[in-house]
């Protein structure tokens, strides 16, 4: 069964293929074909995930999955939240350059914040939408703290700054398998894989 991921982000596609395969789900996850970007107008991760999954299912006629994920920083009252990928305001350059700009701004905003007040959570809402109108949403969260400088070369986004509770290495220093086992996206998509199996076999 083919399922479309409502994203053209290759890093995310690779990550979700690993997670779904490890869940024992036999699906071919394909990237969203080229076309107009869908405006993420929701105010919550769940709303944005559903917006993207609905658009992908409409565009392709296939069951679609999408996620909206981000970083919620305690000291910033939950921001950057749904604006995590656009936090710095930079829209040009490569994804790596935009990630670096986001990280630099976040570090500047937390410059004088002591370690005990640098708590944060990675949050993910994962959505499944079928052409028949079935809609499901699952959630995952990973708590941790933000460091004062980036560490590690793996991962993407805010991974180099994020030290998950119980870990001695940042998300960007973990192997792919280690990160998948604890990540917010891994938690949400493992639950979604169960729903996907039920929907596709019903």
UniProtKB/Swiss-Prot annotation:
Identify which cofactors the protein needs according to its UniProt entry: Mg(2+)
Q: Does the keyword Magnesium apply?
A: yes
Query: What GO MF annotations does this protein's record show?
Result: dITP diphosphatase activity; ITP diphosphatase activity; metal ion binding; nucleotide binding; ribonucleoside triphosphate phosphatase activity; XTP diphosphatase activity
Quote the record's binding site residues for Mg(2+). Answer: 68
**Known EC number(s)?**
3.6.1.66
Q: What does this protein do?
A: Pyrophosphatase that catalyzes the hydrolysis of nucleoside triphosphates to their monophosphate derivatives, with a high preference for the non-canonical purine nucleotides XTP (xanthosine triphosphate), dITP (deoxyinosine triphosphate) and ITP. Seems to function as a house-cleaning enzyme that removes non-canonical purine nucleotides from the nucleotide pool, thus preventing their incorporation into DNA/RNA and avoiding chromosomal lesions.
Tell me the subunit arrangement.
Homodimer.
The entry's protein name is dITP/XTP pyrophosphatase
